Amino acid sequence: MGVCQSFVLTDEMKDQIKVNKEIEKQLEKKKNMQLEQTVLLLGPGESGKSTVMKQMRAMTGNYTKTELHERKVLIIQNLCQFSEMLLEYVREYILEMTEDDDKRYTVMCEELKMAVIHDGIMRPELADTLKEFWGNSAIQDAYSKRDTFHLTDSAKYFFDNIDRIKLPGFEPTNQDIVHIRVPTTGVAQVEVIMNNIKLMICDCGGQRSERRKWYHFFDEADAVLFVAAISEFDQKLAEDEETNRMHESIRLFWTVFNGKFFKKAAVILFLNKIDLFEEKVKHVKIKDYFPKFEGANTVSEGTKFFRRQFREGIHPDFKKRMYTHETCAISDQVQIIINTVIDTVIQDNLKDTGMI
């Protein structure tokens, strides 16, 4: 008959098992960390940066009913803001509008504010007045000069879609959502899972007053996606009427990528609003705002020039890992570019660090 002997662990063996478990725990933690990457979204105000963020959010799945309702209210709020801006321009520059129309449209703006308070419910009569307002010749004249008073590109989109927005069961589409304009203050974050890698996307407010907050995130970034509106080469900043927007974008890009920060981060540059740029170069000369420009006033020559402008002032180390694309952030096609570029950059980052 065999004797079953009990196996007794010595104190030394117990300590070793404890150490092994701790090592395994740390390895598992490290493995999880390896599958997380942080992407910073930087750029000046109104460049389309937050629209890129919304496209990334759309890539993660559908919005909840609550989120859709919140965005419906924001659309009504945007319509109110756009209407007030247009009406103010008409009054300031004494464009031709009857006193009766002025009074009716003032009441319309007040009713829009009430619609925002009452969960985005728009009376049919209010929608009809909005359509009439948009068709008014003085308002259209003001809209044609929108670049001078910083009216966003989304105004026309929402006014053109009043018949759909006014419906009781209206739910915003992804195209509606990417057209919503709410200035980013502070830092907005969204998680995106891409090829089993968790990306933390951080959208940092682009106005000058918000930029001091950027530095808190610089050490954490694995990649930086900088968005600049190429179509704004002839426009001034909303917060500084003396400064050209594209000059500001280029200087900001040079400052961020001067070699002091982001020692290992990849650089992604989106020259955004390429659709508006295509229209603008038909009647606005790049050379009038950038005397260095010597090429033909075409989309091709213009984009080549601005690519060089951004690239020439950054630290040499960044030039080796810089990816540049022309984009239209409001188009769903930009999701393909985002997916391809981000995936390439992150995979390269992980290979460089031996994580994959």
From Swiss-Prot:
Chain positions recorded as Mg(2+) binding sites: S50, T184
Keyword Nucleotide-binding: yes
Protein name: Guanine nucleotide-binding protein alpha-10 subunit
Top-level taxon of the source organism: Eukaryota
Keywords: GTP-binding, Lipoprotein, Magnesium, Metal-binding, Myristate, Nucleotide-binding, Palmitate, Transducer
GO terms under cellular component: cytoplasm; heterotrimeric G-protein complex
Binding site for GTP: 43-50, 178-184, 203-207, 272-275, 329
InterPro entries per record: Gprotein_alpha_su (IPR001019), GproteinA_insert (IPR011025), P-loop_NTPase (IPR027417)
Region annotation G2 motif: where it falls in the sequence: 176-184
GO MF, one example: GTPase activity
SUPFAM superfamilies on file: P-loop containing nucleoside triphosphate hydrolases, Transducin (alpha subunit), insertion domain
Organism: Caenorhabditis elegans
Subunit and interaction comment: G proteins are composed of 3 units; alpha, beta and gamma. The alpha chain contains the guanine nucleotide binding site.
Family to which this protein belongs: Belongs to the G-alpha family.
GO biological-process terms attached to the record: adenylate cyclase-modulating G protein-coupled receptor signaling pathway; short-term memory
PROSITE patterns from the UniProt entry: G_ALPHA
Region (G5 motif) residue spans: 327-331
Region listing for G3 motif, in residue ranges: 199-208
Annotated CDD domains: G-alpha
Keyword GTP-binding included in the entry's annotation: yes
Protein task: Guanine nucleotide-binding proteins (G proteins) are involved as modulators or transducers in various transmembrane signaling systems.
Region of interest: G1 motif: 38-51
Lipidation (S-palmitoyl cysteine): C4
Coiled coil: none
Region G4 motif: start-end pairs: 268-275
Residues carrying lipid (N-myristoyl glycine): G2
Domain (G-alpha): residue spans on this chain: 35-356
